[in-house]
């Protein structure tokens, strides 16, 4: 997920709003002071294995095959002791200089556009929680404000607090390269490309990157009930925070968090080649069939019940009875992705509610009151 600072979430509240805290079960007595920037995580004595993606020789921190056999030990466990999430440790005027570890293409050749998985080394100095965002300041001068640095762009973090290396020293971003094509000529106009996304996707290992944050509370994964149900709805790179949730639930061995509930992911993309982290998610489906469900809406390959393109709201309608029953039982529902996805989803939910003899306005109000409704769109 990416957005300009100040235009991050446009539905219920800004990303940092809502006062949505976190309480974790079985927390230790020691507390990490997130306000102290000198805190550095303990080095993890565990070497990760390589995973080749279905599209190219892409290296991740461990293999899906290993994850299927046993969960991965993570360190430092003190990252789970804090009672409140870290917030705005680094601000735009004083960003933290991190280092690019790797940049890998996530999508196949038939995907419209390019999406990259970018691992950043912050040395344990910019800790975060699942569901938060980093700000990135691309190098150069703001074209609209000569003499000023470029505007901060916010990206949802696509890893757990322990990072893809499981040592608390890295964070991963899921970034779609923003390009502009002239509607008349059909040719790409490099002068109008996304400054930050292209900087990140063009980065090389060892390059420096200025980051701010972490920011955001509304998409934090509530952990007070380890048996809760979480319904996650995403389009494209909106899947980023959910990857962090799911790795925490199913991949990592965190003594203070043992997930026993249901995680249900709905992902909408153009086609099969556009699927993001599909191999990871499919592995969870195979290994935890009682705790994970995974439904895809491929708009260029699938048809909805009316013969039109299959969008994520069509999948929601298909399973609407189950979804509403789960919400009535206290399930959390999350939306992350393009701002344009929300009107169609809201219309679908309203129509389904009316068919059930319910008022969607009242139901939505109750979901927000109960802190079951989480939205981050851009």
Curated annotation (Swiss-Prot):
Organism domain of life: Eukaryota
Principal subcellular localisation of the protein: plastid
Binding site for FAD: 153-156, 174-176, 180, 195-197, 237
Necessary cofactors: FAD
Gene3D superfamilies: Nucleotide-binding domain of ferredoxin-NADP reductase (FNR) module (3.40.50.80), Translation factors (2.40.30.10)
UniProt subcellular location: Plastid, Chloroplast
EC number: 1.18.1.2
Domain FAD-binding FR-type as annotated: residue spans: 93-221
InterPro entries: FAD-bd_FR_type, Flavoprot_Pyr_Nucl_cyt_Rdtase, FNR, FNR_nucleotide-bd, FNR_plant_Cyanobacteria, OxRdtase_FAD/NAD-bd, Riboflavin_synthase-like_b-brl
Record-given protein name: Ferredoxin--NADP reductase, embryo isozyme, chloroplastic
Species this chain originates from: Oryza sativa subsp. japonica
